[in-house]
C-alpha cells in the first residue's frame, strides 16, 4: 500500500467548488449552458482516459509481476482520478437527468418553458413601483459587499499577521479583483436578466461562508503551523480566497447598472451608485456597531445571508412566476442555513483548525482583534489575531520583564505597568514593597478572561485601567503640569502622578498603533511622570548571540530613540532584549542587586544567571548598535518600518519591484487606452481613497 494518503476530500471539494462556480456563471448568463457542458464533458473524458490508462498499466504490472518503481505513485493517481471521474459523472448525469426521466414517462411529450425575463416585461407595474423595486438590487449588492468586507477583513487580519501592510494588501486585492469582475461583464455578450442577477446576488451571500471556512482550513495546510506568512504568501493567499466573491461583486455591479439603465430607459449609473452606497452605509452601521459585538463571524455571515435573501424575496415577488417560485426555495434554504449556523457552534469548531494540538477554551472578537485562549498540558495560551501574547506560568519571561528593571532601584513608590496584568508580570511587581501598581490594558476583554481563569492578583495595591496607554500618560502629564504650575507646595497631589518605574510589556512595533508607544515623543511624556533617576523599561525580540542586519537596525533605532530622552541606556539580553533607560545609573549585574534586596525569584538569581556573562553579552550588543540609526518619531515611524522589514526578512528578501513595476505598466497601458471620463473617474477614486488612508 502507498504511504501517500488519497486526496478524496480535497479533490471532492475542488470539484464541487469549481462546478458550483461554473453553474453560477451559467445561471447568471456569463457563459452558456453549452459551454459549461463542453468543459465538464472534456474533463470527464480526460478523467476516464487517465484513470483507465493507469488502471490498465497497473493490471499488467500485477498480472505479469513486473517490478515498477513508481507503482505506489501510480496507484495514488489512479484512485485520485477515479474520485474525480465519479464526481464529474454525477455532474454529467445531472445535466441529462431529464432524458432519463422521460424514459419512465408514459408520453414522450415534454413541456418546456424557456420563459426569460427581459427588459420590457414590467408592463403590469407602474413606473414608480418598478423603479423602487429595481433600486433594491444595488442596495442588496452594496449591503452584502460591505457587510462581507467588514466581517472578512477582521478574519484575514486574524490569520495573516494583522498590521497595516496586511490591511493594504487585502484591500488592494479586493479593489483590483472587483474591478476585474466589472471588466469581465463588458466581455459578456448576453444581456443581463433578472433571474441571473437575483441568482448572482444570492450567491454573493453564500460565497463568504465558503471563503471563511477555506481561510481557516487552508492556513495550516499551505503554511507550517506557527509560521509567519510572507508578503508574497499574503498576496497570493488573499487573492485566491477573495477572487470568487470580488469577481462576482464587480460583475454584478456592472450588470445591475446596465439592467437598470435598460429597464428605466435612462442612464442609471448614478442611481446604481447611490443605492449601492446606501446599502453599504446601512451594512457599515449594522456590522460595526451591533453585529460584531454580539455575534461571531459565521453567525454574522448567516445574518447577512438572511437579510440579503429577504431583500431578494421582496424583489422577486413582483417578478414573473418562474423567478418568484425559485426564490421561495432560495429564501427557505437561506433561512434554514442561517438559523442552523446561528444555533450550531461552527466558529469554535472551524477556529480549531488554526490551533492543532490545543484545546480552545474561550474566544472573542473585540474591537482590537480576535482574542483566543487555548489550553495544552495545563498551560493557558493567549493569542491576539493568531499571534501569541503570553502563556501562563512562564516564569522566565515574567521575572526578566520585571526584575531586570526594578532591581536597579529600591522601589517603594508607584510603578506603572503597560500590559501584563494577568500574564504573571503584575505578580512579580507586587513582590516589591511598592505603594501602588497601576496597570493599563487596552482590551477590557483581557480582564474578563483574567477573572474567568482566576489570573488576577488579589492585592489592594493593584489598580487596573482600561484604555490607550498613550492617552492615559498624556492626561497624567497634563495634570502634573497644572499642579506644578501652582505657587504652593503640591507634593501630596503629585504622588499619584509620579512613578519610580514604567514597564512597557507590549508587543513589538509591528503596527502604527503600537509604534506610538515606542516613539521619542511618548518616551518624553513618560519621563515627565518619572521621579528623579526613575527608569523606563521596554523589550524587543531576542537576538541571542548573533544579530542580523535587519535585527541590528531595529535594535539600534530603539536604542537611539531612548538615548534622545534619557542619559543612560543599557540592553540586557534574555528571552528578549530588555532596554532600560534612566538618568541615573544602570547595570546588567542584576543577580548581585537581587541578593542585596532579598526578592524571592526562581530564575533571576545567582543560581541561574551569571553577572559577568550578562555584562559581556550586553556589551557585545551595545558595541554593535549604530550611533547613526534614525530616531523613531510620531511623524516618522522608523521603528514600525524597521520592524516590518525585520518580519519580511524571515521569508527572504522580497523584491518589491517585481510587484510595483507590472502594476505601473498596467496603469500606463490602461491610461493610454482609457477615455477622458475614465481617467477622471480613476483620478477621483485614487484621491478619495488616499484621503481615507491618511
Question: Language-model segments: which ranges?
Answer:
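Alpha-helical transmembrane segments of multi-pass membrane proteins
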Residues: 124-480, 486-694
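Membrane-embedded alpha-helical bundles that constitute the cytochrome b-like, heme-associated redox core
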Residues: 1-128
Amino acid at each position: 500500500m502507498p504511504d501517500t494518503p488519497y486526496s478524496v476530500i480535497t479533490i471532492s471539494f475542488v470539484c464541487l467548488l469549481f462546478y458550483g462556480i461554473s453553474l453560477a456563471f451559467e445561471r447568471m448568463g456569463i457563459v452558456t449552458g453549452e459551454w459549461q457542458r463542453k468543459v465538464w464533458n472534456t474533463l470527464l473524458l480526460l478523467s476516464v482516459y487517465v484513470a483507465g490508462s493507469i488502471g490498465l498499466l497497473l493490471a499488467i504490472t500485477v498480472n505479469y509481476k513486473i517490478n515498477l518503481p513508481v507503482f505506489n505513485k501510480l496507484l495514488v493517481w489512479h484512485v485520485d482520478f477515479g474520485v474525480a471521474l465519479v464526481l464529474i459523472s454525477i455532474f454529467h448525469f445531472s445535466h441529462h437527468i431529464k432524458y432519463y426521466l422521460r424514459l419512465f414517462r408514459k408520453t414522450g411529450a415534454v413541456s418546456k418553458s424557456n420563459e426569460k425575463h427581459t427588459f420590457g416585461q414590467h408592463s403590469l407595474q407602474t413606473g414608480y413601483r418598478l423603479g423602487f423595486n429595481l433600486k433594491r438590487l444595488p442596495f442588496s449588492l452594496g449591503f452584502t459587499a460591505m457587510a462581507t468586507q467588514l466581517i472578512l477583513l477582521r478574519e484575514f487580519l486574524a490569520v495573516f499577521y494583522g498590521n497595516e501592510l496586511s490591511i493594504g494588501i487585502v484591500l488592494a486585492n479586493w479593489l483590483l479583483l472587483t474591478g476585474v469582475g466589472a471588466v469581465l461583464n463588458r466581455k459578456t455578450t448576453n444581456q443581463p436578466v433578472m433571474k441571473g442577477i437575483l441568482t448572482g446576488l444570492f450567491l454573493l451571500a453564500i460565497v463568504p461562508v465558503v471563503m471563511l471556512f477555506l481561510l481557516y482550513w487552508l492556513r495550516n495546510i499551505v503554511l507550517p503551523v506557527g509560521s509567519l506568512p510572507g508578503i508574497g504568501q499574503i498576496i497570493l493567499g488573499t487573492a485566491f480566497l477573495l477572487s470568487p466573491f470580488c469577481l462576482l461583486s464587480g460583475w454584478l455591479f456592472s450588470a445591475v447598472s446596465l439592467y437598470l439603465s435598460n429597464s428605466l430607459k435612462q442612464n442609471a449609473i448614478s442611481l446604481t451608485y447611490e443605492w449601492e452606497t446606501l446599502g453599504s452605509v446601512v451594512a457599515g452601521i449594522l456590522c460595526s456597531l451591533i453585529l460584531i459585538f454580539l455575534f461571531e463571524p459565521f453567525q454574522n455571515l448567516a445574518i447577512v445571508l438572511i437579510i440579503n435573501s429577504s431583500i431578494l424575496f421582496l424583489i422577486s415577488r413582483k417578478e414573473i412566476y418562474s423567478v418568484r417560485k425559485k426564490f421561495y426555495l432560495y429564501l427557505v434554504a437561506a433561512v434554514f442555513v442561517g438559523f442552523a449556523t446561528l444555533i450550531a457552534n461552527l466558529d469554535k469548531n472551524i477556529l480549531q483548525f488554526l490551533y492543532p494540538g490545543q484545546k480552545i477554551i474561550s474566544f472573542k472578537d473585540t474591537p482590537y482583534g480576535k482574542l483566543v485562549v487555548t489550553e495544552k498540558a495545563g498551560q493557558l495560551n493567549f493569542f491576539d489575531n493568531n499571534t501569541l501574547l503570553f502563556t501562563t506560568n512562564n516564569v522566565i519571561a515574567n521575572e526578566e520583564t520585571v526584575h531586570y528593571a526594578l532591581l536597579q532601584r529600591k522601589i517603594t513608590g508607584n510603578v506603572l505597568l503597560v500590559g501584563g496584568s494577568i500574564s504573571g508580570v503584575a505578580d512579580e511587581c507586587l513582590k516589591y514593597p511598592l505603594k501602588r501598581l497601576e496597570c493599563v490594558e487596552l482590551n477590557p476583554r483581557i480582564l474578563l478572561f483574567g477573572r474567568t481563569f482566576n489570573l488576577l492578583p488579589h492585592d489592594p495595591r493593584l489598580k487596573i485601567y482600561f484604555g490607550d496607554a498613550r492617552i492615559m500618560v498624556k492626561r497624567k502629564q497634563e495634570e502634573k503640569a497644572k499642579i506644578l504650575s501652582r505657587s504652593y507646595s503640591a507634593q501630596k497631589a503629585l504622588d499619584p502622578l509620579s512613578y519610580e518605574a514604567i514597564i512597557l510589556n507590549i508587543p513589538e512595533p509591528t503596527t502604527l498603533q503600537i509604534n506610538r508607544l515606542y516613539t521619542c515623543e511618548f518616551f518624553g511624556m513618560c519621563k515627565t511622570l518619572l521621579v528623579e533617576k526613575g527608569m523606563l523599561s521596554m523589550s524587543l525580540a531576542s537576538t541571542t548571540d548573533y544579530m542580523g542586519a535587519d535585527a541590528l537596525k531595529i535594535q539600534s533605532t530603539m536604542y537611539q530613540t531612548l538615548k534622545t530622552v534619557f542619559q543612560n541606556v543599557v540592553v540586557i539580553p534574555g528571552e528578549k532584549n530588555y532596554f532600560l533607560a534612566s538618568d541615573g545609573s544602570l547595570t546588567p549585574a542584576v543577580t548581585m542587586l537581587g541578593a542585596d534586596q532579598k526578592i524571592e525569584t526562581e530564575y533571576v538569581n545567582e543560581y541561574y544567571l551569571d553577572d559577568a556573562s550578562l555584562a559581556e553579552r550586553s556589551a557585545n550588543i551595545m558595541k554593535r548598535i549604530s550611533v547613526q540609526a534614525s530616531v523613531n518619531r510620531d511623524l516618522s515611524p522608523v521603528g514600525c518600518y524597521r520592524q516590518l522589514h525585520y518580519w519580511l526578512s524571515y521569508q527572504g528578501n522580497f523584491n518589491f519591484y517585481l510587484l510595483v513595476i507590472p502594476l505601473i505598466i498596467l496603469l500606463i497601458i490602461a491610461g493610454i487606452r482609457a477615455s477622458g471620463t475614465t481617467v477622471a473617474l480613476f483620478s477621483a477614486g485614487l484621491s478619495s481613497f488616499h484621503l481615507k488612508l491618511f
